[in-house]
A protein has these predicted regions:
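Conserved beta-strand scaffold positions in the cores of enzyme catalytic domains, especially
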Residues: 52-54, 109, 184
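Generic structural hydrophobic/aromatic packing signal, biased to beta-strands
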Residues: 38, 55, 72, 122, ...
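Solvent-exposed alpha-helices and their adjacent loops that cap or buttress functional pockets
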Residues: 47-48, 126-128, 154, 177, ...
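Conserved nucleotide-cofactor-binding alpha/beta core module
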Residues: 80-132, 136-147, 151-156, 165
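Detector for small/aliphatic-rich hydrophobic stretches
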Residues: 1-85, 99, 104, 211-215, ...
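Phosphate-binding/switch region of NTP-binding enzymes
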Residues: 167-236
Length: 251
């Protein structure tokens, strides 16, 4: 069988495309967590700017949902500039966001009646550019809409954070559907570590990196965001004792 003759024009075009894609990849800025164990699992060493990232609670309850919102707020807090937060449910507790490092003076809240309008406002804010981050709360994120948001983020270089919120159990199944997001996280509340004195320790979360472009999934046991939006690896997660207990109880 005769071998196909290479077309020099097509070969040159391929080389140019590969060169441009490589340059774009190298120029992509990231927002690191500042924790080597997490950053080394993320392409480029952090969450990519110019992309959208999804966050959801590990269950359908309000506690895990609040943890996901605070996790995203901590990410937004570590950016520079104004943060636009789009929502349809007026139940956001601003002091809690401040506790995660996102001061109210930095946030512009956009409240819409319908979820479709929330996502439209998110897209407009992403296209605007010059913002630290754009956050949107949504139950569903259709592929077509996620692509529009991703293209808007790519065009401006802004960080897009989508918090998936469920009102009922059946809605949580939508989180398994594919989207154009660069990463997908699931956050669950864990018991805080015992203190040597009576009291409640720093909140802890199980942060599951379910999906990441050009990377592998991973689980992290972290202590909740501090006043600067920074996480910290839990001490028993670092020495493996928590994973040991999980294995024993799940066996």
């Amino acid at each position: 069988m005769a071998r196909p003759i290479a077309n020099p024009i097509i070969s040159e075009l391929r080389e140019r495309i590969q060169h441009l894609e490589g340059a774009a990849a190298r120029a992509t800025a990231v927002l690191p967590f500042g924790i080597p164990g997490i950053d080394e699992r993320l392409p480029g060493g952090g969450l990519a700017y110019g992309a959208i990232h999804e966050f959801a609670g590990g269950g359908t309850g309000a506690i895990d949902g609040a943890a996901a919102a605070l996790f995203a707020a901590g990410v937004a807090a570590r950016t520079t500039g104004v943060v636009v937060w789009c929502l349809a449910r007026p139940d956001l507790f601003a002091p809690a966001l401040a506790g995660a490092g996102l001061h109210p003076d930095r946030v512009i809240y956009v409240e819409a009646v319908r979820e479709e309008h929330v996502l439209e406002a998110c897209e407009e804010a992403l296209r605007f550019g010059g913002l630290g981050a754009v956050v949107a709360e949504a139950v569903r994120l259709p592929m077509v809409v996620s692509r529009r948001l991703q293209l808007a983020a790519e065009g401006s270089g802004t960080l897009g954070l989508i918090i998936r919120r469920w009102r009922r159990q059946t809605e949580a199944a939508d989180f398994g559907h594919p989207t154009a997001s660069a990463s997908r996280w699931r956050i669950s509340v864990l018991p805080s570590q015992p203190l040597p004195v009576p009291g409640v320790g720093r909140a802890r979360w199980l942060a599951e990196l379910i999906r990441i472009k050009a990377g592998d999934s991973a689980d992290f046991i972290v202590e909740a965001c501090d006043g600067q939006g920074r996480l910290r690896i839990s001490s028993d997660a670092a020495d493996g004792s928590y994973q040991t207990r999980r294995s024993v109880h799940s066996g």
